[in-house]
């Protein structure tokens, strides 16, 4: 098997790399297109091949968004369109690996989900208003900004992607106006001299309190993680003195929340929607060069920070090659960002105080506990970790119905050594350690490009799950824990209307019922993105960085202190429809989307049907898209050809509803 895999890898290497340019260069051809494909193995041999491809991703210009954990489990791979994609498909097909298109043009997905009219929030601005997909047909929006606690002075654009300077300004403003419970902590600086800052939230006490650590954005491209961490900050501060349980949290514990551990990488991903920039994973450490197989040298920069901690470092799930996305660094704690975490948690202020360590990532909807360096390897207190994790995902699901799975990273994804969560458990002996992979679930195609409409719902539900971890810490220390969702939490299920819950449950029931019976067609297929469910269960600044920090501070001070709260946003459930075909390689996926794109928020939406059907008021018989009538008009057979998709999205128009049949 090894010989065959090596032969296949050599063939891929020869085909894909002749004449290619090193993946590390920061000069990109804006005409290049990248696709996201799903691949799944059918035996151990093909699974081994996929994993070997990931370890050698830099050789083949591949970007693994998600690794396969087992046979039939899908991997998500971003690959350059054209020759690279065709040849990779041929090789994988020969190795008995199923390949299917997920996103034909990743850059268009980026612009559709993350484009904004505010250049201060997102570097590449709004270039694709017409690319927006149709919203779900709802009489009222699912997104409720009232779930974001109001702070009189400190404002942050929740529901949008903002700059690192905006994050720091927001935290500093909170410290200024809420000094009794909030204090800025600077744990270190990056390669480029940016400060790594977080917020300590806790009421003053005469004794040393137990602590909870939360971090986000250790991987540059995982934007939703920092937004969620900032929401944690907002809720703990805004609800202090209002919500009895949160007041108890802040009085009893100290929370240390660092929203962005990788500011250099995060800011780099904001500079362009080009996939190789937006999907950058590592930090921005200086270039390292290695001899090239084709002569000369390959020079690449960046280290995967979540492979750089001292826990079975460099053993599995990482690479010695600087050009790899999972490069673990020259040595353990080689990076200023990881040293900053280590050194701060070893200070007298923090040593032996931390009872919970939560690190936020995306994506897959997973609640992960140690250990992740190898399969079926667990800490001694695994029972308590599982019990709390189960409570957390159950509580999370009661908010919007989003289902998470739980397990170790090795058991649910694939083995990966050198992670911060495993290090916190083994080296710091933290009791409750969790890595949370946020929305979307693994089966959906948006991946890291989470639509802005889903940011607040993601944060709201994750905070509810996080509260179970805090309750466990309080119980561990014999303190009064939260009395739960049913007893008055401000973000409890009670804040969600019955209509909203019915809509969420209806969507999930339809999608879940169709998932098991879906089949692959050789004709054009529709692939849909929804929010729904899983089917299962030393911190020193390097020399010559002062000028970078001065420039960063100048940028910070030049912007206004507070940003107004954004207006009511559209519905959170925003499926993205992608068209793909096995016969036409360069098909323009925007053909139908352009015809049915939505207008601006201030515009009244129209229907392709003559009137708004009264049956839409019946949650058992309704269309979920504006475009159902348009699709049927342009293809009379679409209901039969795309039955699974159309049954879920256009039940009324296609006359799939039992209530429709009874009336007619």
From Swiss-Prot:
Residues noted as binding Zn(2+) in the record, renumbered to the chain: 219, 222, 361
Example of a GO cellular component annotation carried by this entry: cytoplasmic vesicle
Tissue expression from the record: Localizes in stripes along the cuticle.
Propiece residues: 24-110
Gene3D superfamilies, per the entry: Metallocarboxypeptidase-like (3.30.70.340), Zn peptidases (3.40.630.10)
Cofactor(s) listed in the protein's UniProt record: Zn(2+)
Protein name in the entry: Putative carboxypeptidase suro-1
Organism ancestry: Eukaryota, Metazoa, Ecdysozoa, Nematoda, Chromadorea
């Amino acid at each position: 098997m090894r010989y065959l895999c090596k032969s296949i890898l050599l063939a891929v290497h020869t085909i894909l790399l002749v004449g290619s340019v090193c993946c590390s260069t920061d000069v990109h051809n804006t005409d290049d297109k990248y696709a996201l494909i799903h691949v799944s193995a059918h035996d151990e041999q093909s699974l081994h091949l996929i994993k070997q491809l990931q370890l050698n991703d830099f050789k083949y210009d591949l970007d693994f968004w998600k690794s396969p954990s087992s046979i039939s489990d899908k991997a998500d791979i971003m690959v350059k369109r054209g020759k690279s994609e065709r040849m990779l498909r041929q090789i994988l097909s020969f190795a008995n690996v199923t390949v299917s298109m997920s996103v034909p043009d990743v850059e268009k997905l980026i612009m559709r989900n993350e484009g904004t009219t505010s250049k201060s929030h997102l570097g590449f601005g709004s270039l694709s208003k017409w690319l927006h997909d149709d919203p779900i047909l709802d009489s009222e929006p699912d997104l409720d900004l009232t779930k974001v606690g109001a702070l009189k002075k400190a404002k942050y654009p929740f529901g949008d992607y903002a700059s690192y300077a905006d994050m720091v300004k927001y935290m500093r403003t909170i410290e200024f106006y809420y000094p009794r419970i909030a204090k800025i902590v600077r744990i270190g600086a990056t390669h480029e001299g940016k400060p790594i800052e977080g917020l300590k939230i806790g009421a003053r006490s005469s004794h040393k309190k137990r602590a909870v650590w939360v971090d986000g954005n250790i991987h540059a491209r995982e934007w939703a993680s920092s937004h969620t961490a900032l929401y944690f900050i907002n809720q703990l501060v805004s609800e202090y003195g209002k919500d009895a349980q949160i007041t108890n949290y802040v009085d009893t514990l100290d929370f240390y929340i660092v929203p962005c551990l990788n500011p250099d990488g995060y800011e780099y991903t904001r500079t362009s929607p080009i996939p190789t920039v937006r999907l950058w994973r590592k930090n921005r450490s200086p270039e390292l060069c290695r001899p090239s197989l084709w002569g000369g040298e390959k020079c690449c920069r960046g280290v995967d920070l979540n492979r750089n901690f001292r826990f079975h470092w460099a053993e599995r799930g990482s690479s010695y090659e600087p050009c790899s996305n999972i490069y673990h660094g020259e040595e353990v704690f080689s990076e200023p960002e990881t040293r900053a975490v280590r050194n701060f948690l070893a200070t007298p202020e923090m040593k032996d105080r931390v009872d919970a360590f939560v690190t936020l990532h995306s994506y897959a909807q997973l609640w992960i506990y140690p250990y992740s360096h190898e399969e079926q390897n667990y800490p001694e207190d695994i029972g308590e970790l599982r019990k709390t994790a189960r409570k957390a995902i159950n509580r999370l699901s009661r908010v919007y119905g989003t289902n998470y799975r739980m397990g170790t990273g090795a058991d649910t994804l694939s083995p990966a050594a050198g992670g911060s969560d495993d290090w916190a458990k083994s080296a710091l002996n933290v009791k409750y350690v969790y890595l949370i992979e946020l929305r979307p679930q693994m089966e959906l195609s948006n991946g890291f490009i989470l639509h802005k409409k889903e940011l607040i719902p993601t944060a709201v539900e994750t905070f509810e799950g996080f509260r179970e971890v805090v309750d466990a810490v309080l119980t561990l220390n014999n303190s009064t824990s939260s009395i739960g969702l049913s007893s008055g939490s401000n973000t409890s299920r009670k804040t969600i209307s019955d209509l909203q819950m019915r809509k969420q449950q209806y969507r999930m029931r339809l999608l879940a019922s169709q998932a098991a019976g879906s089949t692959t067609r050789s004709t054009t297929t529709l692939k849909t993105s929804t929010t729904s469910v899983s089917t299962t269960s030393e911190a020193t600044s390097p020399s010559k960085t002062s000028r970078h920090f001065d420039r960063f501070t100048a940028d910070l001070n030049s912007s206004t202190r507070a940003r107004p709260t954004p207006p009511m946003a559209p519905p959170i459930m925003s499926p993205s429809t992608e068209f793909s075909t096995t016969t036409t390689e360069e098909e323009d996926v925007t053909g139908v989307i352009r015809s049915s794109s939505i207008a601006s928020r201030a515009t009244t939406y129209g229907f392709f049907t003559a009137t708004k059907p009264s049956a839409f008021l019946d949650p058992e018989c309704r269309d979920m898209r504006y475009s159902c009538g348009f699709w049927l008009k342009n293809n009379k057979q679409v209901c039969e050809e795309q039955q699974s998709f159309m049954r879920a999205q256009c039940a009324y128009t296609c006359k799939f509803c039992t209530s429709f049949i009874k009336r007619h």
